[in-house]
């Protein structure tokens, strides 16, 4: 049921939060700049009007979601810290200090699924509007500056919260699924293979030792055979409504060497994960999905979109479509690195990449191109901040939906923190 609006505030013997707190604090100023009514109007129709318990206020849930990514903490931690931090409570619309937790951590999960990708994109759009209000929209002669119509694009990998995948590790996990499913469903297995698996683990422990290649390969083949037998036996005996069926079907595909959507299975609980090789010396392979980030010359992120493992040049059109939805100014020039070669334009937007200067280019034009691509390199540290400060380095949300919303929430948190810094100059927030 939709939340009940509070029309009456009981008088208190003590001062309210607005009287207690410093209204020049960055969180206080950010709370005043955000148009919370936009979220109320967009999310209220998603609740049932006359059935069920009244829900937690929309501003509270949206504020918790923003604070989680701004402060880079988990659902459980933001709920705990909210009860201890008066500025968090004021940011979420509270008028009196509350010493209790506002909700269960699982309610944030339900709220994210309720608002969906479009709701998270609305939060990103509001973060752009908050920053766009402070930007100069014309030069001294009344013309729009190029900073509004020029953008830079780059891609990075959003790693999923999985361990490094190996066949041995995933086969053992499939066997563990089988043992747990049999215990929960009261199915008696013909053979559990527990003793044999223990011996195989001992053999596979010395995988990197000399003269052990053949015996370890033999143990791998035997483990795959055991996993296949157990999975097929359980699939035959499990009832149709068992919650274990989807997981065991994925496990059977892995045991048989099948693929999902054209790629191998690297995780049994996150089968959509793909392997991406970006040519890094530090990390040869990354397991997750590709994301596209677009920023303006002033450092404002105006586009954040999730993909699978497409070629960089094929992400331009969809990224610009998102920008047209959430950014109020048209993008006339989009600069990328050499990974975006192959596409020179998208609609009214010209796409440029670093290249050898033409013989007809004047020295002024060469200097201008050089300055543009030097400015483009500034997107790299922004991606670094998204990963280290706003939860883009490790995606804890589940499935393709989690891939999509995590990158947008990280970008929105970066923009909100940028607006907070603007209130206090270059001091640390």
What are these regions (language model features)?
Residues 46-58, 72-113, 120, 139:
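Trp/Phe/Arg-rich N-terminal binding region typifying the photolyase-homology
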Residues 332-401, 405:
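Helix-centered, glycine/charged polyanion-binding patches within enzymatic domains
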Residues 1-34, 41, 421-426:
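Charged, often Cys/His-bearing segments associated with DNA-binding zinc-finger transcription factors
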Residues 280-326:
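Electropositive, glycine- and tryptophan-enriched low-complexity nucleic-acid-binding patches
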Residues 95-272:
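Active-site- or DNA-interface-adjacent structural scaffold in DNA-acting proteins
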Residues 25, 62-64, 78-82, 104-108, ...:
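Short, conserved catalytic/metal-binding motifs centered on acidic residues
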Residues 27-66, 70:
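Basic, short loop/linker segments at the boundary and entry of helix-turn-helix/winged-helix-like folds
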């Amino acid at each position: 049921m939709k939340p009940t609006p509070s029309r009456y505030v009981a008088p208190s013997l003590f001062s309210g939060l607005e009287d207690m707190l410093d209204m020049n604090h960055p969180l206080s100023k950010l709370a005043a700049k955000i148009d919370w009514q936009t979220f109320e109007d967009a999310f209220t129709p998603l609740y049932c009007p006359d059935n069920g318990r009244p829900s937690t206020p929309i501003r509270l849930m949206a504020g918790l979601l923003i604070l989680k990514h701004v402060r880079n903490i988990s659902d459980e931690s933001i709920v705990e810290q909210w009860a201890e931090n008066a500025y968090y409570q004021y940011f979420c619309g509270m008028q009196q200090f509350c010493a209790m937790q506002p909700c269960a951590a699982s309610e944030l999960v339900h709220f994210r699924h309720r608002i969906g990708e479009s709701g998270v994109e609305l939060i990103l759009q509001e973060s752009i509007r908050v920053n766009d209000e402070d930007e100069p929209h014309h030069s001294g002669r009344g013309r729009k500056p190029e900073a509004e119509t020029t953008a830079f694009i780059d891609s990075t990998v959003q790693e999923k919260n999985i361990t490094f995948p190996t066949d041995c590790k995933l086969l053992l996990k499939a066997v563990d699924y089988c043992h747990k499913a049999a215990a929960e469903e009261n199915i008696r297995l013909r053979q559990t293979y527990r003793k044999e698996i223990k011996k195989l683990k001992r053999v596979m422990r010395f995988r990197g030792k000399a003269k052990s290649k053949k015996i370890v390969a033999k143990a791998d083949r035997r483990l795959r055979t055991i996993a296949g037998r157990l999975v097929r036996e359980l699939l035959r005996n499990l009832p149709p409504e068992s919650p274990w069926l989807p997981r065991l079907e994925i496990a059977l595909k892995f045991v048989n060497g099948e693929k999902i959507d054209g790629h191998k299975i690297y995780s049994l609980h996150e089968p959509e994960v793909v392997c991406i090789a970006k040519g890094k010396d530090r990390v040869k392979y990354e397991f997750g999905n590709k994301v596209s980030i677009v920023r303006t010359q002033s450092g404002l992120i105006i586009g954040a979109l999730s993909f699978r493992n497409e070629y960089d040049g094929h992400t331009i059109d969809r990224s610009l479509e998102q920008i047209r939805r959430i950014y109020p100014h048209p993008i006339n020039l989009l600069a990328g690195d050499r990974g975006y070669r192959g596409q020179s334009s998208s609609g009214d937007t010209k796409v440029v990449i670093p290249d050898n200067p033409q013989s007809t280019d004047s020295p002024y034009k060469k200097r201008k191109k050089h300055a543009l691509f030097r400015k483009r390199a500034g997107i790299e540290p922004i991606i670094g901040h998204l990963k280290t400060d706003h939860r883009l380095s490790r995606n804890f949300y589940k499935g393709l939906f989690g891939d999509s919303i995590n990158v947008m929430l990280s970008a929105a948190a970066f923009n909100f923190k940028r607006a907070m810094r603007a209130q206090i100059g270059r001091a640390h927030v």
